[in-house]
Amino acid sequence: PDVPAIVVAGEDWNAGVIGIVASRLVEKYYRPSIVLTRQGDIYKGSCRSIAGLHLYEALAACRDTLIQFGGHEMAAGLTLARDRIEDFCRAFANYVDTRMAIEDFTPKISIEALVAPADWTLAAVEELALLEPYGMGNPRPIFGVRNLRPQTAAAIGAEGRHLRMEVGTREHRVAALC
């Protein structure tokens, strides 16, 4: 990949939100992400990982550039001196680059079940709605469909940010909004 990891730093960023920002970077770019905020002569950071990279082990490999660190496989925190930030960025990117294959930077999606387009009925959607609300303890179900092809597509909305389309197989089509 062009960039194996993302490390961003800022002056006096709110330490209470840098973990959220790191998570959003992972969601958007699917790269291990570290967000650092400067506090005097040190940087404190929040880290989030992707599947296949044990974040604590990655930070342990960079320990000579850090004041302290802690965490687990998918999330961690760290502290480093202001004058070590470039050394840390280089060491962390090198560690990620040597441990991850190009296909590791594509997110994997776990599906609940394979379904046929003919099974997508209003009654089925209403039945799924009974499982709401979705969240951490009750994730939104994801279904897979084989041999699905887009049939038509058109941008909609004031800024064209949504897509109205028909998808389906040769035998059955379903309207979809994205």
Which residues make up each language-model segment?
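Acidic, two-metal ion nucleic-acid-processing modules in DNA metabolism proteins
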Residues: 1, 5, 27, 45-178
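Short glycine-cluster motifs
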Residues: 34-49
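Flexible, glycine/threonine-enriched loop-and-boundary segments that flank and lead into catalytic domains
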Residues: 2-22
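Extended beta-strand-rich architecture
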Residues: 21, 27-29, 34, 120
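Fold-independent oxyanion-binding glycine-rich loops
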Residues: 10-11, 25, 38-39
